[in-house]
Each structure stands twice: as C-alpha cells, then as structure tokens.
Amino acid sequence: MIKAGILGSTGYAGAELVRLLTGHPEVEIQFLDSRSYHGKAYEEVYPSLKNIVKGKCASIDLENDFEGIDILFCALPHGLSQEAVKRMMAKGKRVIDLSADFRITDPKVYEAWYDVRHQALGELGKAVYGLSEIYPKEIQEAQLVANPGCYPTSIALALYPLLKENVISTESIIIDAKSGVSGAGRNLNDGTLFSQCNENIKAYSIGTHRHIPEIEQELSLAAGKEMIIQFTPHLVPMNRGILSTIYTTNIKNVKENDIEAIYAHYYEEKRFVRLLKEGKLPQTKAVSGSNYCDIGFKVDPRTNGLIVVSAIDNLVKGAAGQAVQNMNMMLGLKEYIGLEQMPIWP
C-alpha cells in the first residue's frame, strides 16, 4: 500500500483529498495535518465522513513525521508549502503541492503576483507542472509536481490543442470564467457570506487575479510565443464548479468538423476529458463531484469567432482529483484508479 500524508487536510481541497484517497484501493492515509483542528476527530470537522475517516487531526512535525510516508500532498495556502517541500525532497520522497508555490517557473513573476518571497528555488527548478493530460511523461518521472490551479486547468485544457495547431489568434483571447463559492476557500470571508453571495453574481480581480501568470505561462508554451490574455473571473451562487467561456478568433476559418478532429487528436485517449459534439455545450452540473473536464465549442461565422466553453469541478479536476491523478501517474498506477466516481446529478 502507498502511504500518503496530507498537509492542510481540513481546507476544502484537503478534505477532497481525504475523500478521494480514503476510497483509493492502493493508498493508506498516514496523517491528517491541521493546525486549526489539532486533536479533533476528522469526522467532527467533516460530518459527511463519519464512520469512514476515523483518524484525528494533528499538527505535523516537519522534522519527524515524514519518515513513514511515500508521498506528501501539500494543501496549504501559498507561501506555506515551501519548507515542507524542501524537507520532503531532501529525504528523496515525492511531493504533490496544491498551492501556487511551484507552478510559476519564474520566481520573480511569482513574487510580484503573490507578494511572497520564494525560498525554495532549487526545488522550483525541479518542479513539473501537473496538467495531467498535457505533461504525462514529465509527471511520471517527477519528484515534485506543482498541481495546477482551478481556473488554469479549465482554460489550458480548452485552448491547448487550438494553440498547438495554430488555428486561433494569440492576440485577442478573452476569458470569462465563473466559479462556485468553494473556490474562495474555507476561511471566513465577508464576500462569501450566504446573504451576500446567494442570488448574486459578481466579477472580481479583473486583470489582477493571481492565476493570470499561470494561465499565460501555459498558453505561451502551447503557442510557442509569449501571450497576454484578458481574464475576468466571477463568483456565482453555487457550491462548486467552474465554467470558462473563452472568446477567440478563428484565423484559419476552420470548420467545426476539423475542430472536433483537432480535439480528438489530443484527447481521444484521455479518460477525463470529454468533448461535446454537434454544438452541445458544457455545464457544471454534468461534472460535479467528478474528475472530468467537459469541452464544447461553437464557430460563429458572422464574427469569425471560435467560442470555447469548458466545465470542471473546481475541487476535483481543479484541485484534489488532478492531484490524485498525478499521484497515480508518478507511482506507476493506472491514472484513473480512485477517480471513477460518476458526476452527481441533479
């Protein structure tokens, strides 16, 4: 059995890791780190896991408690994973970090957007960006995987094939993305109080969202040239899910059948990417609770536009599910093990 530890187990992404790994036939969870709930039974923190997860939360000693594990999941806020990652890697063990600390390859860009000094530059140089469908070989060989953010996952999977095949303009990409409230995390926040987010939709962080450099980094790699995008996220009154509507210009006047063929070339063998055909478009309910990313598109001949829509569950494919998928790949397992949950409908 694979012995796994989870740092930050009581945040939403950490709790989703606990749920998925508890159901994984090849994994035993060795510890559930939580400073906020130290000594408290995990089922008291998350009643949904009563009689399923029987361990207690504990504040982990970074010096001693890593000895008995094979792989570490860090589900801590940005800036807090770096010391744990350094210590774990020094022991020759493997790490999947769900924070932003190792996603952005240029530390100066990371420091400018996150206002945190990067103190694990050696480890940053060894990190592999964990977009499972795009970098499978690199992930298999990695000691450290930087798990992608939720918005970047939904956007990069949608655009990667089109940019690689040079069928859309790189100059005028506009992304309108909508996220459920769990994307804001579990900490108390005035903006996510029920009475303020229920029956309410609002845009936020226009042009300043911290996922922008991560998105631009990955799209630039796909396009083979530096890209700048216009990204506007919105908070919508649902628990989980991300719907990204992406406006691009169809520079080669590619027809819908050809676009379907492009997506099929990249994703036909990818279990967790589902291409919707015949003009059907994704919806968040159809992926809720699952590791799927649904992608659909529409060609608008009147404007020469190619509009792409993607949907993911922000806590699964956008966080914990992709982390488990990456673990499977790193450890030589079939990548879908522990991730075969069907979406919840309605």
From Swiss-Prot:
Where along the chain is the active site annotated? 150
MF term (GO), any: NADP+ binding
Gene Ontology cellular component?
Answer: cytoplasm
Q: What Pfam families would the database entry show? A: Semialdhyde_dh, Semialdhyde_dhC_1
The metabolic or biological pathway listed in the UniProt record of this protein is: Amino-acid biosynthesis; L-arginine biosynthesis; N(2)-acetyl-L-ornithine from L-glutamate: step 3/4
Q: How is this protein named in the record?
A: N-acetyl-gamma-glutamyl-phosphate reductase
> Which reactions does this protein catalyse?
N-acetyl-L-glutamate 5-semialdehyde + phosphate + NADP(+) = N-acetyl-L-glutamyl 5-phosphate + NADPH + H(+)
Record NCBIfam families: argC
Localization annotation: Cytoplasm
Family the UniProt entry places it in: Belongs to the NAGSA dehydrogenase family. Type 1 subfamily.
Q: What InterPro entries does the record tag this protein with?
A: AGPR_AS, AGPR_type-1, NAD(P)-bd_dom_sf, NAGSA_dehydrogenase, Semialdehyde_DH_NAD-bd
Name the keywords, alphabetized: Amino-acid biosynthesis, Arginine biosynthesis, Cytoplasm, NADP, Oxidoreductase
Instruction: Show the PROSITE patterns listed in the entry.
Output: ARGC
Q: Which SMART domains match?
A: Semialdhyde_dh (SM00859)
What is this protein's function per UniProt?
Catalyzes the NADPH-dependent reduction of N-acetyl-5-glutamyl phosphate to yield N-acetyl-L-glutamate 5-semialdehyde.
EC number of this enzyme: 1.2.1.38
Q: Which BP terms in the Gene Ontology apply to this protein?
A: L-arginine biosynthetic process
